[in-house]
Regions:
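Short, hydrophobic/aromatic beta-strand segments
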Residues: 92-99, 110-112, 154-156
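Bacterial N-terminal signal peptides that target proteins for export
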Residues: 2-15
């Protein structure tokens, strides 16, 4: 009975090793979404940046978890991150001035906008960070600076983390917190 169990364990380990080797080529090159790709990937969500003065502005802080420590820090689970910025206004464009990704130490990892962009009413843009991109660490965050030409519904900014731990899958959301609002 013990021999049979050992054989089963070895076969399972071999299968997992083969599976890992087969999946590595598909994930090794995965990194965070490139700066400037928001304009390309979400062209249908965008409109021209308003020529009028931006009278209202604000910023959101969004904690994200590209990695989570487990077992008293001995193990690490990695997660993909999707940051979503939703224009909650039905009538007015939302200008995004900055989408910046910071690591656990507060160091800028990547800036996702080359220039301000404007979201159409009720539209959304996203930034995706692959599971294999752990540059942010366990205390990563985004800062999203926004503006509008006048009174506007506050944008909805949140991050979805998805990953696997053992044979289970986990998904959770982190909501952005307003850290600055100027004008009304």
């Amino acid at each position: 009975m013990v021999k049979r169990a050992m054989c089963h364990i070895r076969l399972t380990a071999l299968f997992l090793a083969i599976l890992a080797c087969v999946s590595i080529p598909y994930t090794a090159g995965a990194r965070a979404q490139a700066a400037g790709s928001i304009e390309q990937n979400f062209a249908n969500s965008l409109t021209a940046v308003p020529a009028d003065a931006l009278a209202v502005s604000g910023a959101f802080y969004v904690p994200v978890y590209s990695s989570v420590s487990m077992s008293q820090g001995k193990l690490r689970a990695d997660f993909s991150v999707t940051l979503s910025v939703h224009n909650a206004s039905e009538t007015r464009p939302l200008v995004l001035k900055r989408i910046a990704y910071f690591d656990t130490a507060g160091k800028l990892v990547e800036s996702y906008l080359k220039a301000p962009i404007a979201l159409k009413p009720f539209s959304t843009v996203e930034v995706f960070i692959a599971t294999s991109d752990v540059r942010g660490g366990t205390g990563a965050n985004f800062v999203v600076d926004w503006a509008a030409t006048g009174e506007i519904a506050e944008p909805a900014v949140e991050a979805l983390m998805v990953g696997s731990v053992g044979s289970g899958h986990s998904a959770f959301i982190s909501q952005g917190r307003p850290i600055k609002v100027i004008g009304k």
